[in-house]
Amino acid sequence: DNEGEMLTVCLDLLEDADIISGWNSEGYDIPYMVTRVTRVLSKNDTRRFCLWNMLPKQRTFERFGAEQITYDLIGRVHVDYMQLYRKYTYEERHSYSLDAIGEYELGEQKIAYTGTLDSLYNNDFEKFIAYNRQDVALLDKLDKKLQFLDLANQLAHENTVLLPTTMGAVAVTEQAIINHAHKQNLIVPNRRRHEGNTAAAGAYVAHPKKGMHEWIGAIDINSLYPSAIRALNMGPETIIGQLRPTMTDEYIENKITNEKKSFADAWENMFGTLEYEAVMSRRDDVMLTLDWEPSGSDELSAKDVHDLVFASGQKWTLSANGTIFKYNQVGIIPDLLDTWYAERKVMQAKKKEVTTSEEKAFWDKRQLVKKINLNSLYGAILN
């Protein structure tokens, strides 16, 4: 009979909700509902949005270049389906409105009306109800087709994280590494904090050589970053030592200071550090400092370092950054990448086996998630 009763019924329904979701619900529905319950009922009634009689926790976030306010519903599982769609759809859409996405994915749109929702409510209540029902129906049909909530739930269980945590990459990757280590009966050390600037250079992007060229070729390396990590068996527990980059630091600093280049541009045409190049050239006229893990250091010629790594019978290898890794046992991170890579191959095979477009789309989405896991691990471990 009145708005207060309607909001009370809504709160009753939330009591047994497994997952709360909506389209742009983080930016609109949740803050609107919390504010409305506070105004119509009371602030104390907003505790029903949460568990353990707690109040919703206000939080600010940035979206579309503007700062917005929302609320975290303590103890509840809330996932904004618009953000879920943006995360697991790997091409840009011209619009992320529910109307546009509904038309693209389902061939259905929101119910059109003229004027404001307030005037629609007062002048055509039946259409107002139909408008709201269609919004919910579109969301329900989208998830029945895409199954993104099921996918996020699967990722959450596989990596033992909360369902909303799957919206990011760092926490999921970190927990996946920890879980993989525990499966091998290894204890993971606490995270270490480093003071100062710990930023790393991004990927090298070569400047194009302008003009007409003949015999153009392209090389697309399969899962480049994961493949490099696996090939070198890269991991904190597999590090033997590090060539101190004295020459390289001086060279890069000169490029930045005297030639006014950016840090990334200073590496133009360099495959690896100068120390690495000296080692691979087996130069006996270049002396290097090798810092051992966990402590100690030695002064060796580049030729001696080459022989130590590649000709001493040790199962060692050298990265272009001058880090020596051992490969007598597979590292945690390379082994995790091996697992993900194998799982993706299985999913790609299943995609070929099934016959319907819906089944193919189902497996394609899942193999794409594994691809994102593989390629995002490099960036995630920097954090």
Regions found by a protein language model. Give the residues of each.
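Generic, well-ordered alpha-helical scaffold segments in large soluble proteins
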Residues: 10-16, 20-23, 32-36, 40, ...
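Acidic, Mg2+-coordinating catalytic module of metal-dependent nucleases/exonucleases
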Residues: 15-29, 33, 82-170
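Non-catalytic nucleic-acid-binding interfaces of large nucleic-acid enzymes and RNP effectors
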Residues: 15-16, 39-72, 107, 117-118, ...
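Conserved DEDDh/DEDDy metal-dependent 3′-5′ exonuclease domain
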Residues: 1-93
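Short runs of predominantly hydrophobic/aromatic residues within well-ordered alpha helices
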Residues: 7-10, 78-81, 98, 174, ...
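Helical catalytic core of nucleic-acid polymerases
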Residues: 221-383
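Active-site-proximal structural scaffolding
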Residues: 3, 26, 30, 91-95, ...
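Common nucleic-acid-contacting/processivity interface regions adjacent to the catalytic cores
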Residues: 118-259, 359-383
